[in-house]
Amino acid sequence: MAPFPEEVDVFTAPHWRMKQLVGLYCDKLSKTNFSNNNDFRALLQSLYATFKEFKMHEQIENEYIIGLLQQRSQTIYNVHSDNKLSEMLSLFEKGLKNVKNEYEQLNYAKQLKERLEAFTKDFLPHMKEEEEVFQPMLMEYFTYEELKDIKKKVIAQHCSQKDTAELLRGLSLWNQAEERQKFFKYSVDEKSDKEAEVSEQSTGITHLPPEVMVSIFSYLNPQELCRCSQVSTKWSQLAKTGSLWKHLYPVHWARGDWYSGPAAELDTEPDEEWVKSRRDESRAFQEWDEDADIDESEESGEESIAISIAQMEKRLLHGLIHNVLPYVGTSVKTLVLAYSSAVSSKMVRQILELCPNLEHLDLTQTDISDSAFDSWSWLGCCQSLRHLDLSGCEKITDVALEKISRALGILTTHESGLLKTSTSKVTSTTWKNKDITMQSFKQSACLHDVTNKDIGEEVDNEHPWTKPISSDDFTSPYVWMLDAEDLADIEDAVEWRHRNVESLCVMETASNFSCPSSACYSKDIVGLRTSVCWQQHCASPAFAYCGHSYCCTGTALRTMSALPESSALCRKAPRTRLLREKDLIYSGSEKSDQETGRVLLFLSLSGCYQITDHGLRVLTLGGGLPYLEHLNLSGCLTVTGAGLQDLVSACPSLNDEYFYYCDNINGPHADTASGCQNLQCGFRACCRSGE
């Protein structure tokens, strides 16, 4: 019978595990053939893993037991300052790196046995002292309920750290296991043949169909999948099935939480204490010098735990990027890196490049910058994205929003329902209305054949996304030559471009007028796109006229129920046809069955104080954000009411209840929007911080 009630005995259970490990390494030490290099290295690797667990055990005791006891008793100090764990780990590392031959192995073995014997003589009495001396003191200074809570935390920490370490080993050994399986393939096949001769009737789990195995694997968490991948080549391939890796939560996994379901069940804002803990981890990790020999005597237990967790998180992220995502990246739908201590812009960039079909991306309170989105370099490369949370990402600027807007793609209806502006720069002559040639007219009112002999050099693919284009460089786009007496109202015409109409709406712009707004594309856009991405996903009609009354001054809007005969318009020979039907100018009733871009439902830029009106207006390109319901711009200090209005006008589904922006801005929906969420917030930008 234990001397203390089991539910409050904080030492016995963890110490049982430590004593078990001591027995295991003593047994291995006695059985190892130090003349054999494989046996020698296997022992050192096993010892290294064992002593890492010893060190983690001591750190947990420091933080959750001894640290609390020191707060209530002044007689406790330097309990773990005399241990030799770091020295032993250094000894194992030197053996693995420096010992090269049998002679050195035998000399090293002598030193190893002496050091292990000395450590064991100190370590076992050390644990006995904790059980016989410190447990009674805990009973004296803590209540029964407090001790129950302490024990629960101690056991949970031991389990989570052990599970995380096993996951990391699984990730790193994934490819190594495959190589070993290939090496033993023939011997295994030979053995299987012999077993089949003995009992042809027997059926094991290895004979189950792949679809059944994948169904079984779907009940496993990431750690268990990594273990299964090491069983055989077949299991390794099945463990890389994309459907098993749809939802990734590396930050949670590094802390022992193996949830891998849809993100909707995790959409809860953490309390400020939890956020502070994650920020402390991040700061400790950044300050930590990887080359330093950190010992419990040099670092507080709390700081050591924080560094260890951040290190695990970093290794786990590297494991995912190099060993998992190259195989399953296209199937990943959810990536949650919120409050990560170790993630970098480079890591995010690599992950986004490997996961083109993301629907849910959460980078809340991470230290990323605009470069994290460099992999979103072509139009529509992540057009399935529905949820994007960049709350607290203070380094994000308009540059990132330009890349994000480009990645969201272009609405099919937006692309097909607008005028096609010219995409080439005129070098020597200007285009005239008389140059227009019609070759055929269909019900969809397509302008089939338009070109110009004086086409200049190609414009850079990203140009329309990065800066406004001055109309001084080129002239008006092609327009229909219609009866000037039948003019339509300008505001009616603005509505027409958002819906299908039977008659044809035509806009003739004043050639020398340029809207001063950086996000207004009422001006012409140069450059017929020749790259594959542009030809597949968009063309100039995506950049709609802004609809501002003041920028449309001098514009003649006309309607007509039928198109004139080509002879009425043509004065020159027919020109060469454009390459693709998709690039033609038309306005009609054609609609796509399903939108494939700009389906964003949730966008949070809370605390991204470097965002300006330009960044907001970039989001209105390509058809705006027609499905957006939740928009959080709390703490975006430099945006104005005009910029907000431009964005909101491109978000017809926006719910005022989930629309947040600074209370000091006189913006849209001022009476019904929810205001700023960052008031007196300790960890996100706000104009009233400190009040």
From Swiss-Prot:
One of its GO terms (cellular component) is nucleus. Polybiquitinated upon iron and oxygen depletion, leading to its degradation by the proteasome. Ubiquitination is regulated by the hemerythrin-like region that acts as an oxygen and iron sensor. Undergoes constitutive ubiquitin-dependent degradation at the steady state by HERC2. Fe(3+) 1 binds at residues 15, 57, 61, 130. One of its GO terms (molecular function) is iron ion binding. Component of some SCF (SKP1-cullin-F-box) protein ligase complex that plays a central role in iron homeostasis by promoting the ubiquitination and subsequent degradation of IREB2/IRP2. The C-terminal domain of FBXL5 contains a redox-sensitive [2Fe-2S] cluster that, upon oxidation, promotes binding to IRP2 to effect its oxygen-dependent degradation. An iron-sulfur cluster promotes IRP2 polyubiquitination and degradation in response to both iron and oxygen concentrations. Residues 1-159 are annotated as: Hemerythrin-like. Part of a SCF (SKP1-cullin-F-box) protein ligase complex. Interacts with ACO1/IRP1, IREB2/IRP2; the interaction depends on the [2Fe-2S] cluster. Interacts with DCTN1/p150-glued. This is F-box/LRR-repeat protein 5. Residues 202-248 form the F-box domain. Keywords: Cytoplasm, Iron, Iron-sulfur, Leucine-rich repeat, Metal-binding, Nucleus, Repeat, Ubl conjugation, Ubl conjugation pathway. Gene3D superfamilies: 1.20.1280.50, nmb1532 protein domain like (1.20.120.520), Ribonuclease Inhibitor (3.80.10.10). Fe(3+) 2 binds at residues 58, 61, 80, 126, 130. SUPFAM superfamilies: F-box domain (SSF81383), RNI-like (SSF52047).
